């Protein structure tokens, strides 16, 4: 559960409607893979991830980034039940994929950077704080099965 004031919810939702999920998702996942290269071990089937150019031109990175942000957008509709919303993904990432749950936090932080990059002054410190609450809530929900 994420506790946002009504004005924070409205601001988060308004900004999210401007997000280009495919573009931003590919960028966020790409940045995760470049900045934290050990995360690429979870994406061995994606092919060449040996350089930033390879990562950012990789169609599978872009497609999976879109999938991730589409799921994040669904979570924004269910802020009061993130654990329920992400129960299946938590189980998948824990039991089958064995993803270190710390990576969810890293991706959330990278997403905030991507939003700041694209929205500039519109991405105020107050909006950043609201998105940090949301990404923390999502990463906690995704890590729920690990506990």
UniProtKB/Swiss-Prot annotation:
<dbReference type="InterPro" id="IPR012292">
    <property type="entry name" value="Globin/Proto"/>
</dbReference>
<feature type="binding site" description="proximal binding residue">
    <location>
        <position position="93"/>
    </location>
    <ligand>
        <name>heme b</name>
    </ligand>
</feature>
<dbReference type="GO" id="GO:0020037">
    <property type="term" value="F:heme binding"/>
</dbReference>
<comment type="subunit">
    <text>Heterotetramer of two alpha chains and two beta chains.</text>
</comment>
<dbReference type="GO" id="GO:0042744">
    <property type="term" value="P:hydrogen peroxide catabolic process"/>
</dbReference>
<feature type="modified residue" description="Phosphoserine">
    <location>
        <position position="45"/>
    </location>
</feature>
<dbReference type="GO" id="GO:0072562">
    <property type="term" value="C:blood microparticle"/>
</dbReference>
<feature type="binding site" description="distal binding residue">
    <location>
        <position position="64"/>
    </location>
    <ligand>
        <name>heme b</name>
    </ligand>
</feature>
<dbReference type="InterPro" id="IPR002337">
    <property type="entry name" value="Hemoglobin_b"/>
</dbReference>
<dbReference type="GO" id="GO:0046872">
    <property type="term" value="F:metal ion binding"/>
</dbReference>
<feature type="domain" description="Globin">
    <location>
        <begin position="3"/>
        <end position="147"/>
    </location>
</feature>
<keyword id="KW-0479">Metal-binding</keyword>
<dbReference type="Pfam" id="PF00042">
    <property type="entry name" value="Globin"/>
</dbReference>
<keyword id="KW-0007">Acetylation</keyword>
<keyword id="KW-0349">Heme</keyword>
<keyword id="KW-0408">Iron</keyword>
<dbReference type="GO" id="GO:0031720">
    <property type="term" value="F:haptoglobin binding"/>
</dbReference>
<feature type="modified residue" description="N6-acetyllysine">
    <location>
        <position position="145"/>
    </location>
</feature>
<dbReference type="GO" id="GO:0043177">
    <property type="term" value="F:organic acid binding"/>
</dbReference>
<feature type="modified residue" description="S-nitrosocysteine">
    <location>
        <position position="94"/>
    </location>
</feature>
<dbReference type="GO" id="GO:0031838">
    <property type="term" value="C:haptoglobin-hemoglobin complex"/>
</dbReference>
<dbReference type="GO" id="GO:0019825">
    <property type="term" value="F:oxygen binding"/>
</dbReference>
<dbReference type="GO" id="GO:0005833">
    <property type="term" value="C:hemoglobin complex"/>
</dbReference>
<keyword id="KW-0702">S-nitrosylation</keyword>
<protein>
    <recommendedName>
        <fullName>Hemoglobin subunit beta</fullName>
    </recommendedName>
</protein>
<dbReference type="InterPro" id="IPR000971">
    <property type="entry name" value="Globin"/>
</dbReference>
<dbReference type="GO" id="GO:0031721">
    <property type="term" value="F:hemoglobin alpha binding"/>
</dbReference>
<feature type="modified residue" description="N6-acetyllysine">
    <location>
        <position position="60"/>
    </location>
</feature>
<dbReference type="InterPro" id="IPR009050">
    <property type="entry name" value="Globin-like_sf"/>
</dbReference>
<feature type="modified residue" description="N6-acetyllysine">
    <location>
        <position position="83"/>
    </location>
</feature>
<keyword id="KW-0813">Transport</keyword>
<comment type="function">
    <text>Involved in oxygen transport from the lung to the various peripheral tissues.</text>
</comment>
<dbReference type="GO" id="GO:0005344">
    <property type="term" value="F:oxygen carrier activity"/>
</dbReference>
<comment type="similarity">
    <text>Belongs to the globin family.</text>
</comment>
<feature type="modified residue" description="N-acetylvaline">
    <location>
        <position position="2"/>
    </location>
</feature>
<dbReference type="InterPro" id="IPR050056">
    <property type="entry name" value="Hemoglobin_oxygen_transport"/>
</dbReference>
<dbReference type="GO" id="GO:0004601">
    <property type="term" value="F:peroxidase activity"/>
</dbReference>
<keyword id="KW-0561">Oxygen transport</keyword>
<keyword id="KW-0597">Phosphoprotein</keyword>
């Amino acid at each position: 559960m994420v506790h946002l004031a009504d004005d924070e919810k409205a601001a988060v939702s308004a900004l999210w409607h401007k997000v280009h999920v495919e573009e931003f998702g590919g960028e966020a996942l790409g940045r995760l893979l470049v900045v934290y290269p050990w995360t690429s071990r979870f994406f061995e089937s994606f092919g060449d991830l040996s350089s930033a150019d390879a990562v950012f031109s990789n169609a599978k990175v872009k497609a999976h980034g879109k999938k991730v942000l589409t799921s994040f957008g669904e979570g924004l509709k269910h802020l009061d039940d993130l654990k329920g919303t992400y129960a299946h993904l938590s189980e998948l990432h824990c039991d089958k994929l064995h993803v270190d749950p710390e990576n969810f936090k890293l991706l959330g932080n990278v997403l905030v950077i991507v939003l700041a990059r694209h929205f500039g002054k519109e991405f105020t410190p107050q909006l950043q704080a609201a998105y940090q609450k949301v990404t923390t809530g999502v990463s906690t929900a995704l890590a729920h099965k690990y506990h």
